[in-house]
Amino acid sequence: MKAAEEATNVHIEWVEIPASGWKEKINIMFSTDSLPDAIIGAVDMAKNYEQLAELDEMLKEYAPNTTAFFESRDDYPTALYSPDGKIHTLPTGDEAIQNIIDSQLWINQKWLDNLGLQMPTTIDEFKEVLIAFRDKDPNGNGKADEIPFTFRDAWGWGGTIENLFGPFGVLETASHVFTKDGKVTFSAAEQGYYDALEWMNGLYKEGLFDKEAFTLSGDQYASRGAAGDNLGVVAGYRANEAGVVNETDYRAVPVLKGKDGTQ
């Protein structure tokens, strides 16, 4: 921040709020109308848009590149405007992979090659691959030490399995909310959500899921592959989130199709 101040000749007096007291402090600021000039924070502040300045004209005058970027995108206008039709807040515009994709499935291509298997494209093929990883010693060490599929229970962050709901017609997110046919929908109220859980429960019962997946901490997950070439499918922004021995052995699993072709 010091370098930014020197480059712009603008000094900023920062007010740091501990995460534990963030919500209370922000609520007091808005309720007493004692706001700083600008706030970097969570989206829930946007509900107080009437207390925030209108940015539309200022953006056009002082931020033409930002304005042009917004106008070039179909997805930004809906997110930008408050209920009064004005812009009061700005998104971060951070399109790093971890902000575009909550989590990706990565499969051990070397294991596929060792067993003469093709990349799975459907949930049935995916299950058959996991069974082969469990039963056919894909790492070739003569031991039943393979973990067909590992992830961690940290909903909405890397290492999780939200994308396995897609083949059942549900776009699962950390907030459990998605848009369906133009309407905001609660994912856990969809039949496809329960169908997905039932299918995944079957994988767990057959020993195709890592038995410790739901209790792994971030550090434990990061060292899951430390024992050697023992991981078949992992979840994360990158395969090395699970501590795989050789990340170059892993390839992204394509969007899987459900039994009726749903993706």
Residue ranges and their predicted role:
Residues 1-263:
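Extracytoplasmic/secretory soluble proteins
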